């Protein structure tokens, strides 16, 4: 950065807590994309982010409202992944609002954000929670991996087990069955607001 003298920087993902440790050395306007910077004390740092707590809650609310009360979750490690932790908090909030306890040992299965990892996580989840009727996968990629595992175990989706993903990817639109998903949307106005900052 020092040799090229950039006019601005974009930071993608990561835990915002890490910015507290090293961002003070950055002296150009910067934007943190996918995580919030509102609790970070840097005047030259802005952010564009999804409210992952609200998104996690929205996904699980939709499953409860569809009549499900045995809901499993496939997500990243909420201790190690900031985004997974935020979505986990939203899930927990939804469970509480619907009078249910979210027992991590039973209904939550950790996976990497990949088809294969989610496939294996779905198999583990069904083994420990055989009467579940719905799953929230914390990404569309995870949801597709989970659906493949369910089909390989002779479950029908959504007739036997409903699955909802997160991201709203194009792949979700064209997947068969069409994937229910929570869509991340960054309005065009964010781009117009952010680019002049940099």
Language-model features: where?
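A short, hydrophobic C-terminal helix/tail in secreted or cell-surface proteins
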Residues: 194-198
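Short acidic capping loops at alpha-helix termini that bridge into adjacent secondary structure
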Residues: 69-70, 102-106, 157-163
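Flexible loop/turn connectors
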Residues: 123-193
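Periplasmic-binding protein-like
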Residues: 3-13, 72-75, 129-139, 162-164
């Amino acid at each position: 950065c020092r040799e090229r003298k950039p006019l601005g920087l974009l930071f993608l993902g990561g835990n915002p807590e890490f910015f507290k440790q090293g961002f003070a050395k950055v002296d150009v306007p910067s934007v943190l994309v996918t995580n919030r910077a509102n609790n970070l004390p840097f005047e030259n740092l802005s952010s564009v982010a999804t409210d992952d707590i609200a998104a996690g809650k929205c996904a699980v609310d939709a499953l409860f409202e569809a009549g499900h009360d045995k809901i499993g979750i496939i997500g990243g490690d909420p201790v190690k992944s900031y985004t997974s932790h935020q979505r986990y908090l939203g899930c927990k909030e939804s469970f509480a609002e619907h009078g249910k306890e979210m027992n991590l040992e039973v209904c939550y299965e950790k996976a990497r954000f990949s088809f294969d990892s989610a496939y294996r996580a779905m198999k583990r989840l069904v083994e420990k929670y055989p009467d579940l009727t719905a799953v929230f996968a914390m990404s569309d990629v995870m949801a597709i991996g989970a659906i493949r595992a369910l089909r390989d175990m002779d479950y029908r989706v959504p007739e036997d087990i409903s699955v909802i993903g997160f991201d709203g990817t194009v792949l979700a639109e064209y997947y068969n069955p069409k994937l229910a998903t929570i869509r991340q949307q960054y309005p065009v106005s964010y781009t117009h607001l952010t680019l002049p900052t940099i």
